[in-house]
């Protein structure tokens, strides 16, 4: 019995150590909320644009539409400090992202979506991509991560499902892709203007002679932090 218990302890400690080695701590199910039921878009509302969003095969599937500006499928609930995890797969030619603590201009339902956005993009044909870095969508600031800290990387696997982990705590936003830490940003200004808000799944606008392209999300879950 002692040998069995010792073996179980070793395996458990090994799993935790491996998670830490990849830049993430082992997560616990307590406190987590699934934001997508796998069948419907209940709890989500589209803002801006005319891209299409459907619940399909256990995913939220977004498809571009010619002539449409950026489109966002937004959570009906707002969040302040939280940890968000999801899996995403995107066409190599499409840029996407997830809005964090976002708002609409003037608080109007049809106002322009704005706020910090975690970038989603493939690395195909490049020396690396900028997925995981934080952009100031419609804030007038462009990238919130300084140029000298926005190093292209290949943590994103083109054409495959990629796991994102995002932690927003006060003015600090941290992101991981497939267990690799990508971004550790502290931005007091964006936190002052956007201390809480909705999440948004972006389908980026495309040129008239391009597409259609698609992006899909699944296993979307969130834990509010205190």
Predicted features, each with a name:
Residues 18-226:
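Carbohydrate-interacting regions of secretory-pathway proteins
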Residues 4-13:
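Sec-dependent N-terminal signal peptides
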């Amino acid at each position: 019995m002692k040998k069995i218990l010792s073996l179980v302890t070793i395996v458990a400690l090994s799993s935790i150590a491996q998670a830490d080695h990849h830049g993430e701590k082992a997560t616990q199910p307590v406190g987590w909320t699934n934001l997508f039921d796998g069948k419907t878009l209940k709890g989500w509302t589209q803002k801006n644009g005319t891209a299409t969003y459907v619940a399909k095969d256990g995913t939220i599937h977004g498809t571009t539409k010619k002539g449409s500006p950026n489109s966002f499928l937004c959570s009906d609930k707002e969040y302040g400090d939280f940890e968000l995890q999801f899996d995403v797969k995107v066409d190599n030619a499409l840029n996407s992202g997830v809005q964090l603590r976002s708002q609409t201009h003037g608080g109007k339902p049809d106002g322009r979506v704005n706020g910090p956005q975690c970038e989603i993009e493939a690395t195909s044909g490049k020396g690396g991509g900028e997925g995981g870095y934080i952009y100031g969508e419609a804030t007038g600031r462009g990238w919130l991560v300084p140029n000298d800290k926005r190093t292209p990387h290949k943590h994103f696997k083109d054409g495959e499902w990629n796991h994102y982990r995002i932690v927003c705590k006060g003015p600090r936003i941290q992101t991981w892709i497939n267990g690799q830490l990508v971004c550790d940003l502290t931005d007091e200004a964006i936190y002052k203007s956007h201390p809480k808000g909705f999440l948004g799944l972006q389908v980026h606008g495309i040129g008239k002679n391009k597409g259609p392209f698609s992006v899909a999300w699944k296993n979307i879950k969130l834990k509010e932090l205190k």
